[in-house]
């Protein structure tokens, strides 16, 4: 009778132990907390953290020692306001005597140029019925028709003008516009040389620009002067005909 209850007791204990192992939870109640342990040894230093943001600027430090070298020159500033007019200075020393007017070449040259311009203006004004400027030249006419030699004389008062002689297409077009306006022919400042067909300006230089009518010149030395048609083309002609006088200045 005593052996059965003892065997039953062992069986219950075995079953109770099996239940505790499977659930890993003991059914016993928690015990009373123990006393805190003593402080352990200090741990090792941790790894460096990420770089933080820059801090605010610190206060200005005291002045340094010796001054540094001067810096480079800056840019030129804007001009300032005009200053007040200064007082009149003392007269300078008297200069050396100048040359008499008739011996001063520069003065004589200037006076000659002024005289030339005055006479040239007078010549242009005497032909002021029609004037046309091309480059540095002025072409003018008084509308009168005369023989070549009379035209030559009327264009050269005091040697400031001459009979118009085109030396470029632009000048030829300008003279042609005057001829067309008056609806007549005009003499040009050209003459035939000793050799038939060779023409020269009145200063003796060979002609470097021409605008002959087709087939001209064909006077074969008998027509020494040159006339311009209303279309601007040229023809050789004897010098006794009456043609429009056009001058250039």
Swiss-Prot record:
Keywords: Calcium, Collagen, Disulfide bond, Extracellular matrix, Gaseous exchange, Glycoprotein, Hydroxylation, Lectin, Metal-binding, Repeat, Secreted, Signal, Surface film. InterPro entries: C-type_lectin-like (IPR001304), C-type_lectin-like/link_sf (IPR016186), C-type_lectin_CS (IPR018378), Ca-dependent_lectin (IPR051077), CTDL_fold (IPR016187). Residues 133-249 form the C-type lectin domain. Coiled coil: none annotated. Pulmonary surfactant consists of 90% lipid and 10% protein. There are 4 surfactant-associated proteins: 2 collagenous, carbohydrate-binding glycoproteins (SP-A and SP-D) and 2 small hydrophobic proteins (SP-B and SP-C). Residues 42-51, 84-93 have a biased composition (Basic and acidic residues). Residues 1-20 form the signal peptide. The modification 4-hydroxyproline is found at residues 30, 33, 36, 42, 54, 57, 63, 70. It comes from Sus scrofa (Pig). This is Pulmonary surfactant-associated protein A. The lineage of its organism: Eukaryota, Metazoa, Chordata, Craniata, Vertebrata. Oligomeric complex of 6 set of homotrimers. Ca(2+) binds at residues 216, 218, 235-236.
